[in-house]
Curated annotation (Swiss-Prot):
The gene is truA. Belongs to the tRNA pseudouridine synthase TruA family. This is tRNA pseudouridine synthase A. The keyword Isomerase applies. GO terms for molecular function: pseudouridine synthase activity; RNA binding; tRNA pseudouridine(38-40) synthase activity. It comes from the Bacteria.
């Protein structure tokens, strides 16, 4: 068998998530169906580096799969790209070692979360940015977001009941910028891994701080007490993008 690593992007609006679902459309299943057709009906299994939720988008998701033959990488990329649904784009494909695993090989991820604070909202962006039409103090959020950088136990920012035992993660970058129109905010988070709904919970908390309904120091309290009830609401998924996955050499 020959193992390939692919970088893909997708519009998450019409997907129930990346991971295969029993009764709903998923990115994994669509790519597996295309690869199985290319492999003359023999089943191909796709593995993903990240499991994005329903409605979450990806600019740089990484997958791997095995084929029973070797094929020119660009020809394979072109075939997989053109025969996959239009809301999936295959950016690149490369041959990798047989023991490479996109999920378990050491890597870091970067996510972006886009907020539309326009009044009225931009209807063309309704599936691609989370609308928040309330007053926001950007400077307060920029101070608060920096408190998330570093190595912390992020129990207070993960979904209640998550099965992961070790909730310590390292965030190497946490930043917030505003576009030139002032309408769109982009939150960026880079780190060695993120817990279930962690980013959406962090953004929901930061928006509450920006709206002056929480103090900036609430971030410190959430990290110290590890209590989800102290954090803000979970932001909607439509503003979240898996931007990039970087592997160590």
């Amino acid at each position: 068998m020959t193992r390939y690593k692919a970088t893909i992007s997708y519009d998450g609006y019409a997907f129930a998530g990346f991971q295969r679902q029993s009764h709903a459309r998923s990115v994994q299943e669509e790519i597996e169906k295309t690869l199985t057709r290319l492999n003359k009906g023999q089943t191909i299994t796709v593995h993903g580096a990240g499991r994005t939720d329903s409605g979450v988008h990806a600019l740089g998701q990484v997958i791997h799969f095995d084929l029973p033959y070797q094929m020119d990488e660009e020809k394979l990329r072109f075939a997989l790209d053109t025969q996959s649904p239009e809301d999936i784009d295959v950016i690149s494909i490369e041959l990798v070692a047989d023991d490479f695993h996109c999920r378990y090989a050491k890597h870091s991820k970067t996510y972006e979360f886009i907020v539309d604070r326009g009044r009225p909202k931009n209807p063309m962006r309704r599936h691609y940015a989370t609308h928040f039409p309330y007053p926001l103090d950007v400077e307060r959020m920029q101070i608060a977001i920096k408190k998330l950088e570093g190595t912390h136990d992020f129990t207070g920012f993960t979904a209640s009941g998550t099965s992961v035992e070790d909730k310590v993660r390292t965030i190497t970058e946490a930043s917030l910028i505003v576009d030139e129109t002032g309408q769109f905010l982009t939150f960026t988070f880079s780190g060695n891994g993120f817990l279930y709904k962690q980013i959406r919970n962090m953004v929901g908390t930061l928006l509450k701080i920006g709206n002056n309904r929480m103090p900036v120091e609430q971030i410190d309290l959430i990290l110290e007490k590890k209590d989800r009830q102290l954090a803000g609401p979970t932001a909607a998924p439509n503003g979240l993008y898996l931007k990039e996955i970087r592997y160590e050499e």
